[in-house]
Amino acid sequence: MRKIGIIGGTFDPPHYGHLLIANEVYHALNLEEVWFLPNQIPPHKQGRDITSVESRLQMLELATEAEEHFSICLEELSRKGPSYTYDTMLQLTKKYPDVQFHFIIGGDMVEYLPKWYNIEALLDLVTFVGVARPGYKLRTPYPITTVEIPEFAVSSSLLRERYKEKKTCKYLLPEKVQVYIERNGLYES
């Protein structure tokens, strides 16, 4: 059975925090690969202005291209409407029956698990991996594997705000992603 990690998100924009989480879990669990799964429309972000799929995908390709064990999974981008993890993982487990999927989520999402669509059935499809900051306990009634990662306090929303305020984002996201954002005028007021 192959072991593959999946990290989902809008990646608007992708940053070093995403890459750090993926790399730490990859090594901690001896995974074969980590697949980045960009969302079409995340249910918890409906109604929010999201950068185009094309731009988010291009930035994600630039961010992950240097790591041979990172790939991009387009499963959710091929569907219209909200992206529910259960629907996606049902499709992926049918498509890849020889894979044990490890679905990577942040500490904030661990506490949100009881509200996930079809969570009980989803638990039969994936092993959840919760990433925690040092000294932070993940509390959930569901079985999860915990991986402690170094603290790196950056988020896509912080980066969008910094770009709007014309503040530097150097060392927070890959340089090629920065160049793409600046050339395309993303996140300007």
From Swiss-Prot:
InterPro entries: Cyt_trans-like, NadD/NMNAT, Rossmann-like_a/b/a_fold. Its EC number is 2.7.7.18. Pfam families: CTP_transf_like (PF01467). Catalyzes the reversible adenylation of nicotinate mononucleotide (NaMN) to nicotinic acid adenine dinucleotide (NaAD). One of its GO terms (biological process) is NAD biosynthetic process. Pathway: Cofactor biosynthesis; NAD(+) biosynthesis; deamido-NAD(+) from nicotinate D-ribonucleotide: step 1/1. Disulfide bonds: none annotated. This is Probable nicotinate-nucleotide adenylyltransferase. The gene is nadD. It catalyses: nicotinate beta-D-ribonucleotide + ATP + H(+) = deamido-NAD(+) + diphosphate. The keyword Cytoplasm does not apply. It comes from Bacillus anthracis (strain A0248). It comes from the Bacteria. Keywords: ATP-binding, NAD, Nucleotide-binding, Nucleotidyltransferase, Pyridine nucleotide biosynthesis, Transferase. Belongs to the NadD family. One of its GO terms (molecular function) is nicotinate-nucleotide adenylyltransferase activity. It is an enzyme of class 2 (transferase).
